[in-house]
């Protein structure tokens, strides 16, 4: 059924990150799950619980939860291996990356093939 999008969103899609310095595409790609995925919906519930409890960090935790992996991220010339902790650190310290992710994830067409 062409209306069923949850599976494609769960599988994920890749965003190519743009440099905040010059606006050019980088060689850094992040694989994310979309807003129709079960993972995203579960993470949103956790985000809402934190919001109600007036706890910090809910937005970053949400992004970490829907990040499946990455490739091409380097630090001092060495590859940075994907891990939840590394993603958390990136998202806290690179607001330009998180805003690109927010825009990408909210566009359902990024997750639909064809």
What are these model-derived regions, one by one?
Residues 1-50, 111-114:
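Short, charged/polar N-terminal "headpieces" of proteins
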Residues 43-46, 50, 65-66, 89-90, ...:
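Residues that form generic nucleotide/phosphate-binding pockets
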Residues 51-59, 91-96:
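Structural motif
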Residues 62-79:
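Mid-chain, well-packed structural core segment of small domains
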Residues 76-114:
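C-terminal charged interaction modules
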């Amino acid at each position: 059924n062409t209306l069923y999008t949850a599976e494609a969103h769960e599988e994920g899609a890749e965003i190519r990150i743009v440099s905040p310095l010059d606006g050019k595409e980088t060689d850094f790609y992040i694989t994310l799950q979309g807003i129709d995925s079960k993972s995203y919906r579960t993470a949103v519930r956790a985000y809402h619980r934190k919001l109600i409890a007036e706890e910090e960090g809910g937005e970053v935790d949400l992004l970490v939860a829907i990040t499946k992996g990455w490739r091409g991220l380097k630090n001092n010339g060495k590859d940075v291996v994907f891990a939840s902790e590394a993603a958390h650190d990136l998202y806290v310290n690179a607001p330009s990356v998180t805003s690109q992710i927010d825009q990408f994830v909210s566009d359902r067409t990024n997750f639909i093939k064809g």
